[in-house]
A protein has these predicted regions:
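A short acidic/small-residue loop/turn micro-motif
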Residues: 143-145
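N-terminal intrinsically disordered, cationic/polar leader segments
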Residues: 1-93, 97-124, 128-130, 134-135, ...
Length: 160
């Protein structure tokens, strides 16, 4: 993408709820790039790092979040790659590419909302995830971003 971008600070909280298991929250703060694509259309890019539980190796994924008032798309490129599209009340089917093989996946969006501001913004998702045709989890993702010029701070803890 050859558009000009704005550096942003990103605070992301993701929670997965599995049957008969405790909630699994993940929160991190990172830096990224914000691309304004229109008054109600933006894209954020950042790198996500996670440690492989078996090998201890750090794996990086390039994340691209494209969001508008009607749709949020998450594209992940790296060792684990996929595309997920979220729109209220709709189901999206795709493929989850892993080093161990490919798996069919589907998401059913229960909530998808975003706010695009000139110096800050947020997006919120609540969805059900199925892998290989089986219900896997109910997930929630809340992301806040701010530019250096924003007077508002990114909250260190995001209330659910």
């Amino acid at each position: 993408m050859n558009q000009e971008h704005t550096p942003v600070l990103i605070n992301l909280l993701a929670t997965a709820r599995y049957d008969r298991m405790p909630e699994v929250p993940i929160q991190f703060i990172t830096v990224g790039k914000l691309f304004y694509r229109g008054p109600e259309d933006a894209q954020i890019q950042y790198v996500e790092s996670q440690q492989d539980e078996e090998t201890g190796e750090i794996m990086n994924s390039d994340i691209s979040l494209t969001f508008s008032k009607d749709k949020i798309t998450i594209q992940r490129q790296g060792d684990f790659s996929n595309t997920m599209v979220f729109s209220n009340g709709k189901r999206f089917e795709g493929v989850y590419h892993t080093p161990y093989g490919e798996m069919d996946m589907a998401v059913y969006t229960r909530e998808a909302a975003c706010r695009i501001g000139s110096g800050d913004g947020s997006l919120h998702l609540k969805y059900q995830l199925s892998i290989q045709g089986n219900y896997t989890s109910t997930n929630e993702l809340h992301l806040e971003y701010k530019t250096d010029g924003s007077k508002k701070g990114v909250r260190k803890g995001i209330k659910q």
